[in-house]
Amino acid sequence: RRRYWDVAEAPIRLLIGKSTPLGLYPTFISPRTGAWTTAKVTMGALSDSFYEYLVKQWLLTGRREPYLRQMFDEAMLAMARHMVQRSSPSGFVYVADYMGHGQLAHKMDHLACFAGAMLAVGAQDGGSYDAEYMTLADAIGETCYEMYRRT
């Protein structure tokens, strides 16, 4: 039904064309003004589902809403460029929190482990970034496996 689509789509429509720091979506936005209220970007708590649902919503619409895929791709490329880190000396790949102004919090919330599966879902389209997404998905999955195995 169109009525439900319009209600569910309203928050996404608000974000289309909105200026985002480095192509990433901060954790909080004002419901009154639509302005970002923090510079923090995370793949962990309070943000994990947003990124996941971009690609899932695109798939659920039969891939007929290209802006959803575009938002997903832009965010994933920005995440890879600005948030993905490698630990030393173990060499595990993790997704740090972006705190704004080029600053990272070098930790990975366990909820960010979903990012591996999310990237794998996003790589099933024959798109331009499939190989990059799968490589990163595998690395994040390995990190999360080891994180749980070792604790």
Feature map (PLM): residue ranges:
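Glycan-recognition and catalytic cores of secretory/periplasmic carbohydrate-active enzymes
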Residues: 1-151
